[in-house]
Structure formats: C-alpha cells, structure tokens
Regions:
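Cytochrome P450 heme-binding Cys-pocket and its upstream "meander" loop
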Residues: 216-245
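Extended, intrinsically disordered, low-complexity segments
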Residues: 258, 470-511
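Alpha/beta enzyme core
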Residues: 256-328, 336-446, 450-468, 475-477
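Cytochrome P450 heme-thiolate monooxygenase catalytic core
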Residues: 58, 71-168
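Cytochrome P450 catalytic-core helices
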Residues: 153-179, 238-254
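Conserved cytochrome P450 K-helix E-x-x-R motif and the immediately C-terminal K′/meander segment
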Residues: 140-146, 176-219
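Active-site substrate-recognition loop segments, prototypically the cytochrome P450 B′-helix/B-C loop
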Residues: 1-86, 93-103, 237
Length: 511
C-alpha cells in the first residue's frame, strides 16, 4: 500500500485553485472517544471546519445564522474600548463573545484560550477537554440532543477560529497600518493544510485520495489583489466582515456614524443631492445619509462635470449641507488637483464644513485613468490629514471601459493606502460583483442600474453601498421640462409636486 504524498503549493494561482477545490478538505478529526460535548475530539468532529459534503453545508449554515444575528458594526462596538492589558487572543474572544451576547465573556475567553491550540492540532491534554465540557455547559446548559450539541459546537468553533487568526491580524496591524495592507503583505494565516478526500487534479498535479496538500499563503499572497487568508468558496470564511470589524475595534480605531452605515450587513442606498433642498428632502424621507452629485453641482453652474471646474462650488455646497441635521458625503471628482497635499487640504476644508465622507475618482476628463500610484498617494494624504473622513476610492475602469480586468488590482492599491471603501461605477453584472467582493477588504460601492440587480440582491452579493449618482438630478430636470411642456401643449400635468410650505420648511432657518 502506497504512503500518502505531500504536495506543496506556493504560487497564487495554484493556492487559489487548491482552496477552491471541494475535494481538498481540512485534515479530518480523530475518532471521538467518550461522551459528546466533553472533548476537543468531539468539538473537531462536530464543526464545519473539519467536515465535508452535507455535514459541512449544514454546519456552515449554523455559523452563518449565528453571524447574521449581528452586524459587523455591532462587533466593532463591542470590541471598542476593550482592556488592552490582556493578550490579543483573550481580547478577540471576549469581544466576539460579548457581541454575540454570550454569558460571562471573560470566562468564555479563558476557556477558549485553553481549547484553541488543541483544536488546531497541538496536544492540549485533558485540560483542553475539560475546557470544552465547561464551555458546553456554560453556553448550552442542559442540552444533550445531537442537534443542540452540534449547534453549540459550531458556536464554540466560531470563537476558537477567531482566536488565533484575528489576534494575529490585530498584532500585525498596530501603529496605524491598514488591515488591508496586512492581509496582502503579511497575512496572519501563513500556511493552510488540506487532505484529499478523493483523487483530484490541481494546477497540473495529480493528487491521490489521502494525499496532504500544504498551502504557503505567505509566499503566494505577495503582489496579488485578493487576500487568501479568508479562503475561497466553497469554504470561504463566513465571518470575514465580522473579523475585520472586530480587529478594527480592538485596535481602537473609531467607526464614525457614517462609516457604521457601511457595516450593517446590507447595502446602504445613498441618494445623491445637488443643493441643500434636495439633500434635506431626501433626509426628511428617511434616508440615513446623502451624497452629492458632481454633475448636478457643475450643471447647475453651467460648467462641465469632471473637469476640475467646481472646487470652490463644492466646498460652498458642503458648507450649506453642513447646516443640516444629516450625514453627507461629497463627490470631489479627482480632488481637483494632482498634488496630494492640495487634495488633503481640500478634504480638511470639506470635513470642517461638516462632510462625513469624500469620493475621489481616478478617471480623468480626457477619458484616461490617473496613475494608480498617484491616486493612492491622494488617498493616503487625505487619511493622514483627516482620519475621520470616510474616503471612498473610485476607479473608473468599468465606467470608461479601460481594462476592467485591472479593477481588483487598482482597488487593492487604494485599500493599502487607507481607503475606507471603494467605488466601481459601471459594474452591474452579478458574477463580476460577486468576484470583486471576494477580492476586497473594504466595503464595495456600486452605481445603481435600472437594468441590474435591486438593492436587496446587491446586498446579498456583498455590496455595501449603492449610489444613485446623477440619476435624481437628471430625473428632476426631465420632470421640470415635461411639466412645462405639458402645460404649454395643454396636456395633463403629472402632479405630485411638494407643497410650497413643505419646501420652505426644509430650510434650516439660521439665515
């Protein structure tokens, strides 16, 4: 009988192929001895991580349901202000346990710490087994049936898996280093192991049933856009957004009210206004925040859009919007300059006027894209000058039809520079959106398309912000023209106009 062969992969394409191959699964757990709920072996044999086939799908659904109960922003809130004197692993588990409303988060963290090393294959001894039994008793007292025990096992597994990987991310992302940079340059999970559940072929290599596959994520990740640390479908980490929010909270990085809207586990619909009245009317309708449309600002002044002609008008509009009781983000084209210091100065002016966010685009008026390094320098300069301003880094690869295949690479550079979110107008196909969200660390913003997916479906695909761009402004112009024409031609008027008093009431009343 032949012995299993060990295959080592260190190139990005082959590692990604191995992670995506359903035949390659984590090393199977050892057979369980003893009663259920009382050992590390039972835990490993009951969680999604070490399962395959139907058992994996069923257990993964349990984890997804657990995570669906809370938004990443809630995880960030629970982790913020944590006691920094304890070790990162304890802080990670305590923060996640608190967010999930588990009893005695401090005790849960202590017990998970005793289980973690044994869970990942090291010898934890009887102490680790006793810690598992205590966790089961604490999190599911009195539960003895198989279904209930499987559910609590996957709750514990969620905590254990967060323990090491998220703690490593927290340690590596200190001193203000963006987590996106860490995940691509120094991934916290550097090696993964898989076992072939059946014969398969990966990157031209024949892998027999039982063979071991060692994946060097650290070597494979260098210079590539999509982070490998969260795996790939069908076994991609379901808690990716929660882990990132947890790390940011533990690092003491505040999440502004505007940023929080991007971490609710669904898509934020951001309508775009062009003056105070339109912004105030949208806010009165219940929209949690508004953006501005550069086309509306420019056209209202008789100027071209995208030609860096409305810098002062944009600042003045921000000053007017800042008088209102609503959150708003400003479309600032490319920052109205190719000097990062000047863009940072503009960003500070907008922030001081009341803006919660800024859009910076890499498309130029001549139909070309700005050098990626230049746009990244603008982003970094803004984040250094105004850390509390949400920077939405836009790439126009799809909008201008210039090398859409380079979109993920450009966005990865912008994320490394510190972008809080990224925007890809013109991207509307479902497969492209799903592929891009898998490659990103920060929230994805797309432009609404009447021919594309609706808001709920975009949220399910991983989109976290949907802008309306100039649509409302163009609709308003069309409505004004059609109403005037109908009156002139004796036709019916559509009606539905806001009463004079309602429009008058939108003004903040401070002169």
């Amino acid at each position: 009988m032949s012995h299993p062969t060990t295959h080592e992969f260190s190139q990005y394409a082959e590692v990604l192929a191995a992670l995506s191959d359903p035949a390659l699964v984590p090393p199977p757990p050892v057979p369980v001895e003893g009663p259920p709920g009382a050992s590390v072996a039972w835990l490993r044999g009951s969680v999604a991580r070490f399962a395959s086939g139907e058992a994996h799908r069923r257990r993964r659904a349990l984890v997804e349901a657990e995570l669906a109960r809370l938004a990443p922003a809630d995880v960030h809130r629970a982790a913020s202000g944590a006691d920094t004197r304890s070790d990162p692993r304890t802080r990670v588990v305590r923060g996640l346990a608190a967010a999930l409303h588990m009893p005695e988060p401090e005790r849960v963290a202590r017990e998970v710490g005793a289980v973690a090393d044994a869970y990942f294959g090291e010898d934890g001894g009887p102490g680790a087994d006793r810690a598992v039994a205590r966790l089961v008793a604490l999190l599911a007292p009195g539960v003895v049936d198989d279904t209930g025990l499987e559910a609590v096992a996957n709750r514990i597994g969620l905590l254990v898996q967060a323990c090491a990987a998220t703690a490593a991310l927290v340690e590596a992302a200190g001193d203000g280093v963006p987590t996106a940079r860490v995940l691509r340059d120094d991934p916290p999970v550097r090696v993964m192991r898989r076992t072939a559940a059946r014969a398969t072929r990966v990157a031209g290599r024949e892998i027999a049933e039982g063979d071991e596959v060692v994946l060097d994520l650290g070597a494979a990740q260098q210079g590539h856009a999509a982070p490998l640390a969260f795996g790939a479908p069908p076994r991609a980490c379901p808690g990716r957004a929660h882990a990132l929010a947890l790390a940011e909270g533990l690092l003491g990085r505040p999440m502004t009210p505007f940023a929080r809207l991007h971490h609710q586990g669904k898509a934020l619909l951001l309508p775009n206004a062009w003056d105070y009245a339109s912004a105030a009317a949208l806010a009165a309708e219940g929209f949690e925040a508004v953006g501005t449309t550069s086309l509306g600002v420019a056209a209202g002044l008789g100027l071209p859009d995208g030609a860096a002609a409305t810098k002062e008008a944009t600042v003045e509009l921000a000053g007017r919007l800042g008088r209102g009781p609503f959150l708003f983000s400003v479309d600032a084209e490319g920052g109205f300059s190719d000097n990062p210091a000047e863009v940072a100065l503009l960003a500070r002016r907008l922030y001081e006027a009341g803006a919660a966010g800024i859009n910076l685009e890499d498309g130029r008026a001549d139909g070309t894209l700005a050098p990626v390094e230049l746009h990244a320098a603008k982003i970094a300069a803004v984040k250094e000058a105004v850390p509390g301003l949400f920077v939405n880094a836009r790439t126009d690869t799809y909008w201008l039809g210039i090398a859409p295949e380079r979109t993920a690479g450009r966005l990865a550079v912008y994320e490394r520079a510190g972008a809080d979110g990224v925007f890809v107008p013109g991207l509307s196909d479902r497969a492209g959106i799903a592929a891009l969200t898998a490659a990103l660390v920060t929230p994805l913003n797309v432009l609404y398309s009447p021919a594309g997916p609706g808001i709920a479906e975009l949220g399910a695909l991983g989109v976290r912000r949907v802008s309306l761009g100039s649509l409302l402004y163009r609709e308003a112009l069309a409505g004004a023209v059609s109403t005037a024409a109908a009156i002139r031609d004796g036709g019916p008027v559509r009606g539905g106009a806001l009463p004079y008093a309602d429009v008058q009431a939108l003004a903040p009343g401070d002169g």
